[in-house]
């Protein structure tokens, strides 16, 4: 009897560690290979004239050009802007939890009620920009730190940083090649590596393109 209790408790602890005991957890979007099964509608949460809006649209266009070049019908969807404010303290906490790769409570109602599937939050907070996925409602949230903070003040960094986080949102993970878009932890490259006085998006690796082809094949369709 004692052995049976130990086994059951061990399984419960394992399930808790894997986020299996509750469906109300947010998952850090680091692991690669989880693609969209529909065209995600995008909602940008930002002040009306936020200077990061052009970089956000450029990053979305970069990915849609990439999908066209790969021959897949998948695209990032229509873009809507709302001027709601997500508390910077919440985004800072969420960023820290994503970095720790831990499960955490699902997005609050303020976020869940926002329109769209993919939320790009242009914040005034100071945190590590991140991407997180809701396990309950299917929303993905990309949090972008203040444009007044280093290294987002450097030329060419902002559009590449947003494109990098959108890369996570569409299913790509990190690599260790600092000359490419998806380089990131645990490799030492950070967003300042995107600095350039020539406007350009950093490239994808061949492996990134192979993975995108698997997630979004030429016969991809919404389901």
Regions found by a protein language model. Name each.
Residues 30-62:
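Fold-level signature of zinc-dependent metallopeptidase catalytic domains
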């Amino acid at each position: 009897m004692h052995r049976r209790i130990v086994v059951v408790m061990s399984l419960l602890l394992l399930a808790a560690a894997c986020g299996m005991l509750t469906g109300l957890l947010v998952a850090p979007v680091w692991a690669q290979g989880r693609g969209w099964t529909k065209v995600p509608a995008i909602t940008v949460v930002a002040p009306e004239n936020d200077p990061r809006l052009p970089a956000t649209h450029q990053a979305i266009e970069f990915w849609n050009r990439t999908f066209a070049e790969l021959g897949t019908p998948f695209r990032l969807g229509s873009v809507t802007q709302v001027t709601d404010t997500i508390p910077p303290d919440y985004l800072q906490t969420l960023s820290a939890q994503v970095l720790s790769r831990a499960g955490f409570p699902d997005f609050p109602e303020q976020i869940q009620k926002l329109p769209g599937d993919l939320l790009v939050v242009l914040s005034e907070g100071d945190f590590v920009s991140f991407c997180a996925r809701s396990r309950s409602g299917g929303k993905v949230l990309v949090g972008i730190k203040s444009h007044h903070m280093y290294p987002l003040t450097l030329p060419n960094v902002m559009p590449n940083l947003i494109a990098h986080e959108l890369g996570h949102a569409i299913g790509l993970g990190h690599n260790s090649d600092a000359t490419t878009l998806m380089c990131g932890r645990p490799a030492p490259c950070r967003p300042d590596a995107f600095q350039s006085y020539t406007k350009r998006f950093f490239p994808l690796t061949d492996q990134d393109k192979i993975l995108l082809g698997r997630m979004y094949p030429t016969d991809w369709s919404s389901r």
